[in-house]
C-alpha cells in the first residue's frame, strides 16, 4: 500500500443490494488532497499533542495523497456496484465523483507502543448537480510493531487497509441512495409526460 524509503518497499443500509437490471453509475476518483502539513513525502510524528515533527532520514516514496488514488480505484471497483471506477484523467462520462482528503497521517509516540493515526474525509458528488450525495470522515489508529519509522509504515498500511474497507461500504451505500433518488425523480415525471402525450 504505502511505503517509505526507509522500507523500500445520511446512515444507509449496511449491506446494499443493487438491482442488476438497472444501469450502474460510473464513478470518477478525484485526486486525493491533503490537509496542510500532510501534503509532503516527509513522515510526520509527534511526541506530545502540541508539537508535530518530521523524521530526518525517512520519507514516503511519494506523497501519501498521490499513492492513495490507485488504491481507492481498485478497492471501490472490486465492489461491483459501479459500471466503472476511473481516475480523474479518464475522458469517460461519469455520474458520480469521489472527493477525498487526508486529514491526518502521523505516528504518535505519546504512549507505548506508538500508534499511527490515519484520518480520511470522503464525499460522493453528483456530477450533474454538483450536490453532495454523502460525506463521512474515517479514522483508524493502529499500534506499531516497533517504535520507529519502519514500524510506522507497517501500521500505516494496516490503517489504510481498514479505511479502504469502510470506504467501499460507504461508497456502495451512497450509490444505492443516489440511484433510489434517481428512480424516484423519474417516476415523478411520468404523469406529466403521460398527460402531455394524451393532450397531443
Where are these regions (language model features)?
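A structural "domain/chain start" motif
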Residues: 1-65, 174-200
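Surface-exposed short loop/turn segments
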Residues: 1-12, 79-129, 145, 197-199
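Soluble periplasmic/extracytoplasmic beta-strand elements of cell-envelope proteins
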Residues: 26-31, 44, 97-102, 117-123, ...
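Short secondary-structure boundary motifs at beta->alpha junctions and helix caps
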Residues: 52-59, 128-169
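Solvent-exposed amphipathic alpha-helical surface segments
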Residues: 79, 83, 167-170, 174, ...
Amino acid at each position: 500500500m504505502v511505503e517509505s524509503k526507509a522500507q523500500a518497499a445520511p446512515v444507509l443500509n449496511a449491506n446494499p443490494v443493487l438491482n442488476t437490471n438497472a444501469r450502474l453509475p460510473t464513478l470518477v476518483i478525484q485526486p486525493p488532497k491533503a490537509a496542510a502539513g500532510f501534503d509532503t513525502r516527509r513522515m510526520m510524528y509527534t511526541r506530545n499533542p502540541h508539537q508535530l515533527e518530521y523524521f530526518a532520514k525517512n520519507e514516503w516514496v511519494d506523497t501519501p495523497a498521490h499513492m492513495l488514488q490507485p488504491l481507492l480505484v481498485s478497492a471501490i471497483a472490486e465492489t461491483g456496484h459501479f459500471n466503472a471506477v476511473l481516475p480523474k484523467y479518464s475522458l469517460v462520462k461519469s455520474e458520480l465523483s469521489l472527493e477525498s482528503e487526508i486529514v491526518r497521517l502521523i505516528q504518535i509516540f505519546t504512549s507505548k507502543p506508538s500508534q499511527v493515526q490515519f484520518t480520511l474525509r470522503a464525499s460522493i458528488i453528483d456530477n450533474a448537480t454538483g450536490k453532495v450525495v454523502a460525506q463521512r470522515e474515517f479514522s483508524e489508529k493502529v499500534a506499531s510493531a516497533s517504535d520507529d519509522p519502519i514500524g510506522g509504515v507497517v501500521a500505516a498500511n494496516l490503517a489504510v487497509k481498514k479505511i479502504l474497507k469502510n470506504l467501499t461500504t460507504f461508497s456502495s451505500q451512497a450509490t444505492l441512495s443516489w440511484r433510489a433518488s434517481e428512480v424516484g425523480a423519474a417516476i415523478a415525471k411520468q404523469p406529466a409526460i403521460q398527460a402531455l402525450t394524451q393532450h397531443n
